[in-house]
A protein has these predicted regions:
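N-terminal transmembrane signal-anchor/hairpin module of polytopic inner-membrane proteins
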Residues: 2-76
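Juxtamembrane "helix exit" motif at the C-terminal ends of alpha-helical transmembrane segments
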Residues: 2, 67-83, 163-176
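Acidic (Asp/Glu-rich) catalytic motifs at the cytosolic membrane interface
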Residues: 10-19, 175-207
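Polar-ligand-bearing catalytic/cofactor-coordination segments
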Residues: 102-170, 181-191, 198, 221
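Hydrophobic alpha-helical segments of integral membrane proteins
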Residues: 26-44, 125, 146, 150, ...
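Conserved small/polar residues in nucleotide/adenosyl-binding loops
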Residues: 14, 215-222
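Hydrophobic alpha-helical membrane-embedded segments
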Residues: 6-21, 86-112
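Hydrophobic, aromatic-rich membrane-embedded alpha-helical segments
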Residues: 97-99, 158-176, 210-217
């Protein structure tokens, strides 16, 4: 029951405040740990494809497990003091694990410009949430780009964290964010990360399989009805 209230409270906090720039975010510290492990393991392990894959596998073990154990220990500590403190820390971390407010704001900006039939403004609005050139998009193209991007980001920014929260509270949600952050930093198919990022990328694929499949299915249904 406490997990339910932690998730609900976290969702409300995210809807109201989003991610204030002045507030330290766990993902920032996760990124620092990933960078440290990347540098350190490359120095220690053989500079071969196999050595790099081992380094990536070690990173893919240390960060998620460490995140879960550390956040779980902090939650346990606060619950031992009083259940209210435990609930509050879980609510806070649940809110930080979500990215719903920013996603809703940006997608609504696109919708408003489309409603006004202002194509240049709609292109500009959608350019803030997609990673490709939008200058040549039609009204239909802008709509499809927005739906596809919202579906993709809803999967790893809302649906997956919520699912993790309901199963394992804030510690599991933060663990998911750690996996997602690893993929964002290491999951490139270039010379530097093709081997080191292999296991982190596979782990992210596994963690996202159910939530992303669901959101892509819903997005496909939406696009078919346009």
């Amino acid at each position: 029951m406490l997990i339910f209230f932690a998730v609900l409270g976290g969702f409300i906090l995210d809807a109201i405040f989003g991610d204030p720039l002045w507030l330290p975010h766990p993902v920032v510290y996760m990124g620092k740990v990933i960078s440290f492990l990347d540098r350190s393991l490359r120095k220690i392990l053989p500079k071969t494809p196999r050595g790099e894959r081992i380094g990536g596998a070690i990173t893919a073990f240390i960060l998620p497990v460490g995140t879960f154990l550390l956040s779980g220990a902090v939650c346990f500590f606060f619950y031992k003091i009083h259940w209210v403190f435990g609930l509050l820390i879980q609510m806070f971390w649940c809110a930080q694990s979500l990215a719903a407010k920013g996603l809703v704001q940006e997608s609504c900006n696109v919708y408003k410009e489309l409603k006004k039939n202002d194509l240049p403004a709609a292109r500009k609005a959608v350019s803030r949430i997609v990673g490709r050139d939008t200058d040549a998009l039609s009204m239909e193209g802008v709509t499809k780009a927005a739906v596809e991007t919202v579906a993709e980001n809803a999967g790893d920014g809302v649906i997956a964290p919520l699912l993790c929260m309901l199963i394992g509270g804030a510690p599991l949600a933060l663990t998911y964010k750690a996996i997602n952050t690893m993929d964002s930093m290491l999951g490139y198919k270039n010379e530097k990360y093709i081997n080191f990022g292999r296991v982190p990328a596979k782990l992210d694929d596994a963690a996202n399989y159910i939530p992303v499949s669901y959101t892509h299915l819903r997005a496909h249904e939406t696009l078919m009805n346009l």
